[in-house]
Amino acid sequence: MASREKTSIEGHMFDVVVIGGGISGLSAAKLLAEHEVDVLVLEARDRVGGRTYTVRNEHVDYVDVGGAYVGPTQNRILRLSKELGLETYKVNVNERLVQYVKGKTYPFRGAFPPVWNPIAYLDYNNLWRTMDNMGKEIPADAPWEAPHAEEWDKMTMKDLIDKICWTKTARRFASLFVNINVTSEPHEVSALWFLWYVKQCGGTTRIFSVTNGGQERKFVGGSGQVSERIMERLGDRVKLKRPVTYVDQSDDNIIIETLNHELYECKYVISAIPPTLTAKIHFRPELPSERNQLIQRLPMGAIIKCMMYYKEAFWKKKDYCGCMIIEDEEAPISITLDDTKPDGSLPAIMGFILARKADRLAKLHKEIRKRKICELYAKVLGSQEALQPVHYEEKNWCEEQYSGGCYTAYFPPGIMTHYGRVIRQPFGRIYFAGTETATHWSGYMEGAVEAGERTAREVLNALGRVAEKDLKTQEPESKDVPAMEITHTFWERNLPSVTGLLKLIGFTTSVTALWIVAYKFRLLRRS
């Protein structure tokens, strides 16, 4: 240890070193700097932003190949971005959305595709209602304390879907719902974790919707600007190309070593990287057993984000907005949104290759993926113009060694109740941020800001700069992006499930049969 201390950078002692220059780490550093804390950010990549990444070139002007969407109730990221001088614009859903299933295209309006089969409708309605009701039982800040936590954590979402749904159509869409929201498969994720994830995003409608939902808006100029503008404010307190390999808190001060053997000394550390990536760091003393087990059990989701550019927005000729929900195992893309610039320039469709499909299609050449996507769009939109793109951008997040995947880490069965409670617990003088540790919109930019600012306040409290009563803060609603209450009709609240309908039919049939028997018996007695 003595030799490490002697070679520390310029002998400078920082109050706090933040590991990770994504939105979570930088929002933590920003808040610390505002309290005149001597803070340094170490980022492994040659850029800031983490799982947000705005690419700029002559073909696209700018494009978000990572996290991009914000919406109502995401008040922290909206407040932070406004402070940084950023503006949002609404994702276009003025025209009709389309659902593609069994080789046919069905235009619709609203958050979810309509269901015309009455039995399937009951099944769909019961699915969303049941998931939301189960979510109400789960504390956002302590899902492992839910009344049925142990039972639900032993189940996969596939188990739960099979238990709730009677029809193939409902099971198929429920599986797609999991793919789209957490970029993983229903058989991979804990039912408890997924129900918690949906709940802390505001429920099934809020998380899936564009209008009044998680995908309502994007940032003019790209989401990467959030991190870039914080970096501009912090100046030389952000260092790029510094992967951290060693953290030693065995002495009075913490010593941090990077891959290129630079040493930094500080009083506190904030880790703002995905939980699984902390396994790349050597800790002294070693991590507690529960945290060590946790970080080995949280895989990242799998996604390839694809943007197809066209000469014109040809889909609008058919009164389509560009949003497609695609239920087809052979289709590369599962969901799309219009990615045209807010001024109408550079028409584009953004599509997600998700979960099992991301793994399968990653093995193909980029040009083959591009061709398959164009052929799919031509089929779904019924237009040969889809075969004539002018440019294509994509980002395979599975190959990013300093992310490991996107959007977020997921909990397999059994992990949340056994190890989940340590995800936000400090280890000595090391505090843990990152969107995975958030309790509201975890997995989104909003969760990243919440987690970063929480850990900053925890460190400020340890430094004696913030009182313990101020550790938890209530974020006021954004005045620029107000949330509308999500309501449900009388029928949505009260229609029976398929099981309930069958029981009702069985009961009424039994009552009718008994009445007939009793009536005939009375006639016999009279005769």
From Swiss-Prot:
It holds the Pfam family Amino_oxidase. The modification N-acetylmethionine is found at M1. The modification S-8alpha-FAD cysteine is found at C406. Residues 519-527 are mitochondrial intermembrane. GO terms for biological process: catecholamine metabolic process. GO terms for cellular component: mitochondrial outer membrane; mitochondrion. This is Amine oxidase [flavin-containing] A. It comes from Canis lupus familiaris. The gene is MAOA.
